Amino acid sequence: MSLENKNIIITAGGTGGHIYPALAIAELLRQNKANVTWVGTPNNMEASIVPEYFNIQFIKSSGVRRKGIIKKITFPLKLAYNTLKSRSLLKKLKADLVIGFGGYVSGPICLAAAQINIPVIIHEQNAKIGLTNRILAKFATTICLAFEIENLHKQFSSKQLAKTKIVGNPVRKEIVALNDKARIYTDSSTLKILVLGGSQGAKAINEIIPKLIQKSNEQGINIKVWHQTGKLSLEETKDAYKDISQNHIKDIAAFIDDMAIAYNWADLVICRAGALTVSECAIAGLPAIFIPLPSAVDDHQFFNAQNIVNNNAGFCLRQQQMTLENLLAIIKPLNQDRSKLEQMSKMAKKTLIKNSSEQILDCVKKILNNK
């Protein structure tokens, strides 16, 4: 089925974990000649990222979780108001279908679409279903999940389960391309470690990695690090590296512009376990040491990592377990026997769904074909 002249609304916002999978789908829809419009919030990350690629409309929306009593009282009124505004926007855009990728903005847009009989697809990136998507699941035409979710039958009705499909996380095409490339781990003198702190940085990771490099050198492990610190911790982290030879540092930067190059360079990654990072590591076949964010809602980052860990393709340390001793206990054997990294790489590639974007595109075409 052709999507030519079909008006498809993408709604996602707040964090890169919502935005980048949505961008991958939006680009594929555009390649299939659909008219794509993005709906986000004006003060979040999507406002600075999306306009370079797609037309974006804004709805002011915020969440209620962990907020004060006043905001909890006024939240239903704000949601109703934003839903009415969203209905008007969807009618103006002559929307044929809405795809929600999470973030608070997805709530009013997807609710409005359901109210005026516009089909809705929602996509959950994490291994725990977020509050917004738990609510929207009742109204969605199709529910797409990135991971198998524990005890899903206790969270969804039989009707909701019947319209649920596991599709994986959409990943940028340049990272998907790494899936076809075999990683060759030679017993060279240098172990290349990529450190990812996420867009906001990870203070605990940023603090321990320079100490890890120093300790490794003392024990004869030659590590070279490419360290993405996040925007808040760059100078502080650079200062922690001041006594470490430049021979052990590839780069220290707030952001990495081309993640495909970084993934391709690395032998091993140390990172949080956000859904997108986990999926990208798996598709790229990159062994990982995951340090889940302790404050993640419903501990979802810990659960995101479990599929890779259970398939012997990575490790997971709680933040309180992230000591020099525990990190070295993982890194030493991998450094001594690089074939272990090669085996982990092969297993990682088997854990994630490679054609996630195409599966979601297929859902779009089936819904519009039956509309």
UniProtKB/Swiss-Prot annotation:
E.C. number: 2.4.1.227
EC class of the enzyme, as a word: transferase
Metabolic or biological pathway, per its Swiss-Prot or TrEMBL entry: Cell wall biogenesis; peptidoglycan biosynthesis
An example Gene Ontology molecular-function term: undecaprenyldiphospho-muramoylpentapeptide beta-N-acetylglucosaminyltransferase activity
Any Gene Ontology biological process: carbohydrate metabolic process
Reaction catalysed by this enzyme: di-trans,octa-cis-undecaprenyl diphospho-N-acetyl-alpha-D-muramoyl-L-alanyl-D-glutamyl-meso-2,6-diaminopimeloyl-D-alanyl-D-alanine + UDP-N-acetyl-alpha-D-glucosamine = di-trans,octa-cis-undecaprenyl diphospho-[N-acetyl-alpha-D-glucosaminyl-(1->4)]-N-acetyl-alpha-D-muramoyl-L-alanyl-D-glutamyl-meso-2,6-diaminopimeloyl-D-alanyl-D-alanine + UDP + H(+)
Protein's UniProt keywords contain Cytoplasm: no
Keywords, in A-Z order: Cell cycle, Cell division, Cell inner membrane, Cell membrane, Cell shape, Cell wall biogenesis/degradation, Glycosyltransferase, Membrane, Peptidoglycan synthesis, Transferase
Membrane-protein topology: Peripheral membrane protein
InterPro entries per record: GlcNAc_MurG (IPR006009), Glyco_trans_28_C (IPR007235), GlycoTrans_28_N (IPR004276)
Cellular component annotations (GO), alphabetically ordered: plasma membrane
Pfam families given in the database record: Glyco_tran_28_C (PF04101), Glyco_transf_28 (PF03033)
Residues where UDP-N-acetyl-alpha-D-glucosamine binds: 15-17, 126, 172, 199, 256, 275-280, 301
Subcellular locations according to the entry: Cell inner membrane
Described purpose of this protein according to its UniProt entry: Cell wall formation. Catalyzes the transfer of a GlcNAc subunit on undecaprenyl-pyrophosphoryl-MurNAc-pentapeptide (lipid intermediate I) to form undecaprenyl-pyrophosphoryl-MurNAc-(pentapeptide)GlcNAc (lipid intermediate II).
Similarity section: Belongs to the glycosyltransferase 28 family. MurG subfamily.
HAMAP family for the chain: MurG
PANTHER family: GLYCOSYLTRANSFERASE (PTHR21015:SF22), UDP-N-ACETYLGLUCOSAMINE--N-ACETYLMURAMYL-(PENTAPEPTIDE) PYROPHOSPHORYL-UNDECAPRENOL N-ACETYLGLUCOSAMINE TRANSFERASE 1 (PTHR21015)
NCBIfam families per record: murG (TIGR01133)
Name listed for the protein in its UniProt record: UDP-N-acetylglucosamine--N-acetylmuramyl-(pentapeptide) pyrophosphoryl-undecaprenol N-acetylglucosamine transferase
Gene name, Swiss-Prot/TrEMBL: murG
